[in-house]
Amino acid sequence: MATNHLVLSGTITRSRSFKSPAGIAHSVIMLEHKSQCFEAEMLRNVYCQMQVIFSGERFESVTEQLKSGVDIEVQGFIALQQSRNGQNRLVLHAENVELKT
C-alpha cells in the first residue's frame, strides 16, 4: 500500500461549514502556510495555500474554532478534487487537527 500522509501548519484565511445530503457535517477551510526550509544548502522561503476538508462527527467539537486568523496544525491525506469549472487541485482531508495558541 502506498503512503499518503501530510502534516501542514498555518493560518486559516477562510472557512465554511455545511452538511451533505447524507447529513454528514463538513468544514472547509483555506490554510495559508509560510515557512523557511533548506534546499541545496540554501534557505528558501516557502508559501502555499491549501484547501482542507474536515468531515464527520469527530471534528464537530472544533468546528466553531476553525475561523479566519486561527493557527492550526493539521494531519491527513491529500486527494485530487475537480472543481465545477474543470480545474484540478490537491486538497487535504483532515484526520487530526491541533489548534495553536
Curated annotation (Swiss-Prot):
Gene Ontology MF annotations: single-stranded DNA binding
Pfam families: SSB_1
Keyword line: DNA replication, DNA-binding, Primosome
Entry's Gene Ontology BP terms: DNA replication, synthesis of primer
One cellular-component annotation, GO: primosome complex
Domain SSB: 1-101
Protein family (similarity comment): Belongs to the PriB family.
HAMAP family in the record: PriB
Protein task: Involved in the restart of stalled replication forks, which reloads the replicative helicase on sites other than the origin of replication; the PriA-PriB pathway is the major replication restart pathway. During primosome assembly it facilitates complex formation between PriA and DnaT on DNA; stabilizes PriA on DNA. Stimulates the DNA unwinding activity of PriA helicase.
NCBIfam families assigned: PriB_gamma
Binding partners and assembly: Homodimer. Interacts with PriA and DnaT. Component of the replication restart primosome. Primosome assembly occurs via a 'hand-off' mechanism. PriA binds to replication forks, subsequently PriB then DnaT bind; DnaT then displaces ssDNA to generate the helicase loading substrate.
Name of this protein: Replication restart protein PriB
Originating organism: Shewanella sediminis (strain HAW-EB3)
Lineage of the organism: Bacteria, Pseudomonadati, Pseudomonadota, Gammaproteobacteria, Alteromonadales
